[in-house]
């Protein structure tokens, strides 16, 4: 297994992996499968290009993408971990940890000492995983954009000095 930041040539793998994630766990993400499927190929090509504002990471088993995560800089300057997903058969095999580590390192490399994410506390497995990765819950809640009836809570990771 290896993990790397995407490049423009990875757009088809990024698109396929993201759409698979949105079908597999539709209530875990702020975007819907329908909205992501409507993106033009040019949009996916642009998304695959890594920048300090947005970097997607793909995990691969040989040449097959098996997981995804991204670092996105929000308009308020917060650095976010988003789009975290691993194919079912690869869960529990350190793929998710590798993806989180890649996003953390990307954030640090871009000058951030703090990384945030949103998770539904009812998603016990995900919340426990993020806590093991050093994230802590903050008293901040909001509705999930794709499913407004679901409330997500912000979690935060801070780089140790």
Task: State where each predicted segment sits.
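Acetyl-CoA-dependent GNAT
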Residues: 8-9, 15-89, 100-102, 106, ...
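Long alpha-helical, hydrophobic tracts
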Residues: 1-4, 8
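Conserved G/P- and acidic residue-centered "switch" motifs that form tight phosphate/ATP-binding loops
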Residues: 94
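C-terminal "cap" of GNAT-fold acetyltransferases
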Residues: 113-116, 120-127, 132-161
């Amino acid at each position: 297994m290896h993990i790397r930041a995407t490049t423009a040539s990875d757009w088809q793998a990024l698109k396929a992996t993201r759409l698979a994630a949105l079908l597999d766990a539709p209530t875990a993400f702020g975007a819907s499968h329908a909205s992501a499927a409507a993106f033009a190929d040019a949009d996916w090509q642009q998304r695959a290009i890594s920048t300090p504002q947005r970097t997607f990471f793909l995990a691969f088993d040989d040449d097959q993408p098996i997981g995804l995560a991204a670092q996105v800089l929000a308009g308020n300057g917060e650095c976010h971990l988003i789009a975290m997903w691993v194919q079912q058969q690869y869960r529990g095999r350190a793929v998710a940890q590798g993806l989180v580590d890649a996003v953390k390192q990307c954030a640090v490399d871009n000058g951030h000492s703090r990384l945030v994410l949103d998770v539904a506390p009812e998603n016990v497995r995900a919340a426990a995983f993020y806590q093991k990765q050093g994230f802590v819950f903050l008293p901040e809640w909001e509705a999930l954009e794709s499913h407004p009836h679901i409330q997500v809570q912000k979690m935060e990771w801070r780089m140790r000095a």
